[in-house]
Design a protein with these regions (language model features):
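Conserved catalytic core of the tyrosine transesterase superfamily
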Residues: 1-302
Length: 302
């Protein structure tokens, strides 16, 4: 037998000295799961946490819609089926359907490295034709009279400075120039920076608000906290800048969160739902029967 021949050949050879124990080959690091790859790709590009949450959510729904098939095995046809089902069965809005599409295109282009061509046969969600809600100046005054402190300040900035809701919430202390009566809006619509005026009516209450926020920030620093997330690559270049007063949020959240990358406790800006709920309640208290939202005040301003 062949095995026996090999055995005899080995016996005829001189005995070899004992070999030094060889190190076990190190196993290559396990490839991250798909959704973790998506999260990492989003964070590398410095997208917002809201975008990360939305994209991961849509990708999960896409996978479950196709009975947990891996996206690498699917393509244009499966994307079209999913998007059409959103319009026909879930009756989502056109903007929601577009967000789902953007999430899937990000998955294929940026994570899987797979080009997606023209997606045929998608049933498009209908764009509702709605007239903008317009408030009279008296209605605005009535609503403002039903708002408290920071909610009042935020609405005044939407109304007087023409800020969008998220532009207001993302304001940093350094963006307010009291001397020049200006506000710097960073990465606004179209990812562009712009200046807008600081309304005279809010200068004094805003200064008092910031003094209160400064005291809260000082207490955070004393507890070893006080860091906020920074845009782009600033955090890598200047590790301690995130604790500086100028980079703090004008409208910070009341609680901290755990940064998923660093594990550090940080403070984010207020969630948009805080002002949305406050405005809804103020409209009700003012006895106004219009579907007004924070964005409505910007329409009045412009």
């Amino acid at each position: 037998m062949e095995t026996a021949n090999i055995y005899r050949l080995n016996r005829d050879r001189p005995a070899a000295s004992p070999a030094a124990p060889t190190a076990k080959p190190t196993s290559s690091p396990q490839k991250p799961k798909l959704l973790d790859q998506v999260r990492q790709a989003i964070r590398t590009r410095h997208y917002s946490y809201m975008t990360e949450k939305a994209y991961v959510g849509w990708i999960k729904r896409f996978i479950f819609f196709h009975n947990k098939r891996h996206p690498a095995e699917m393509g244009e046809a499966e994307i079209a089926q999913f998007l059409s089902a959103l319009a026909q069965e879930k009756h989502v809005s056109a903007s929601t359907q577009n967000q789902a599409l953007n999430a899937l295109l990000f998955l294929y282009h940026e994570v899987l490295g797979k080009e997606i061509g023209y997606i045929n046969g998608v049933v498009r969600a209908k764009r509702p034709i709605r007239l903008p809600v317009v408030l009279t100046r008296q209605e605005v005054r009535s609503i403002l009279g039903c708002l408290d402190s920071s909610d009042w300040l935020m609405v005044m900035l939407l109304y007087g400075a023409g800020l969008r809701l998220m532009e207001c919430l993302r304001l940093r202390v350094k963006d307010i120039d009291f001397g020049a009566n200006q506000i710097l809006v960073r990465a606004g619509k179209g990812d562009k920076d712009r200046h807008t005026m600081l309304p005279a009516a809010v200068k004094e209450p805003l200064a008092k608000h910031l003094e209160l926020i400064r005291r809260h920030h000082q207490r955070d620093l004393e507890r070893g906290l006080g860091r906020v997330a920074l845009p782009n690559a600033l955090e890598r270049k200047y590790p301690n800048v995130g604790k500086e007063w100028g980079w703090q949020w004008v409208f910070p959240a009341t609680s901290h969160y755990i940064d998923k990358v660093t594990g550090e406790r940080r403070r984010h800006h207020l969630h948009e739902s805080v002002l949305q709920k406050a405005v809804k309640e103020a409209v009700r208290k003012a006895g106004i029967f219009k579907p007004a939202s924070p964005h409505t005040f910007r329409n009045v301003s412009t």
